[in-house]
């Protein structure tokens, strides 16, 4: 249902001048969502299915979702999907804020860190400063033996990128 909520919002934002071409945003998002849905469908074998592989790898852990910029809301939504659909506790944080306090918690987590899996929402066009923060954060927390995964936004436009990460 989430994509359907965005379409009227895109049209409205175009009418008030916040975006230039709502049709292009929506069209690309639909195409990307079809591709992502097909490649992650229940009929797609696990070795070719990102969603299934991710689910198998994070099973039995508490998912921690990290986002930035446009993916801040996506991180929160994924956390809510874990809670609602998978019936597991989860948490989310966002860059750059998470680098202030979150890292200290991981440095002191010890064996408890093994109970968590960290999902970084990434983007090929992410700002260099964010890329550096993500890579540094991955280095710091990988010392704690946690499972680390990346979910990369697909497409060129913001709507497609955001929705492609939500539907995994």
What are these regions (language model features)?
Residues 1-168:
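A SIS-like phosphosugar-recognition module
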């Amino acid at each position: 249902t989430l994509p359907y909520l965005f379409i009227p919002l895109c049209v409205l934002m175009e009418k008030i001048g916040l975006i230039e071409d709502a049709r292009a945003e929506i069209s690309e998002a639909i195409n990307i969502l079809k591709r992502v849905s097909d490649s992650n469908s229940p009929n797609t074998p696990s070795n070719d299915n990102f969603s299934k592989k991710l689910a198998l790898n994070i099973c039995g852990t508490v998912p921690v979702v990290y986002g930035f910029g446009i993916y801040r809301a996506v991180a929160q939504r994924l956390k809510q999907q874990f809670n609602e659909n998978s019936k597991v506790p989860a948490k989310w944080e966002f860059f750059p804020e998470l680098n202030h306090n979150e890292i200290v918690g991981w440095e002191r987590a010890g064996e408890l860190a093994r109970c968590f899996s960290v999902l970084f929402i990434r983007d090929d066009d992410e700002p260099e400063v964010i890329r550096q923060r993500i890579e540094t954060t991955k280095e710091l927390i990988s010392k704690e033996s946690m499972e680390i995964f990346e979910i990369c936004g697909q497409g060129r436009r913001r709507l497609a990128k955001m929705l492609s990460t939500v539907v995994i």
